[in-house]
Amino acid sequence: MDLQRMLDRCRREQWTVDDLDWSARPRSLSRADEEAIVQLFTDMAGIERLAGALFEEQQRRAQDPVLREIFATFIADEERHAVVAEQLAAFYNVHRYRTYQINEHLRKFRPHFLRALRYLSDDVANMYITGGELILDIALLRSINDYVADEMSERAMALINRDESRHIAIDYHMTGYYASPAYLAELAQRPPPSLLTRVKAWYTFLGLIYRAAPFSRAVFFQPMRLVDPTGRRMREAFKRMQLMSSQQGIDNTPFGKLQLFLLQVSHHPVAGPLLRGVAARIAGIEPEFMQRLYSDEEMARARRMDFDGLAREALASKLAS
């Protein structure tokens, strides 16, 4: 990837909340739909700010000055998305049936997640952001937009999705780097962490795993059952994660080995039905998404591609789903 070209694109495609015309009126909604839509956008604001915190950590760790500038634009993107989500919540809150607050599980997860960021290795932090962005871009945002079915949401989501596509391109690029011999060489040159740091890292990581499942269920899986009841887009997002997680070099790091092991256990013809629930709990997702979601042909094709090619194919899948 040409990082300077990507940075130029990031700067060129910036926009503001005021670029959207907020003077329109929303379409008529039932009470149930209005309450659901306002809550969805309220939670979306919290999710976007969580993504922004991850990009702040990635910017802090990045050594390449161009990459740091790219992450700076991503941080601005996520805050802008959060503000737009808040304004969309207000826009559709016509009847003010009740008071809306960010989902309790999202609120409780945030401080533990931010604390864990300080101890997560580079590849782990990147894998969390990549997974979250794939769910957002391929599944959640587009399904919310279809559910709302209103011009105001469509205009906002078009701009947000354009930003998220840039994010995913960089997420995959960084995943490729963390799967490379160059990253292993960089790790070997770093001084080993102290025993106290390793203990804190494991403690925060185990705490993150413990809280990830209820967070993911409340913020991603339950809303998707409402806005995408067939689960088609969610399966597509997790298929892209599985294809990426099976690429050469992913198992270079302990977290990559754990990911691959959980997938292999879940896909095993004998152990899978017995242990898939346990593997899903560790991964923080629903068991159905630990099943094998790709064909042999799709895996063979993916293994012939580099990570930038996988990103392009993941983004192209949005149009097909």
Predicted regions located by residue number:
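Non-heme di-metal
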Residues: M1-S321
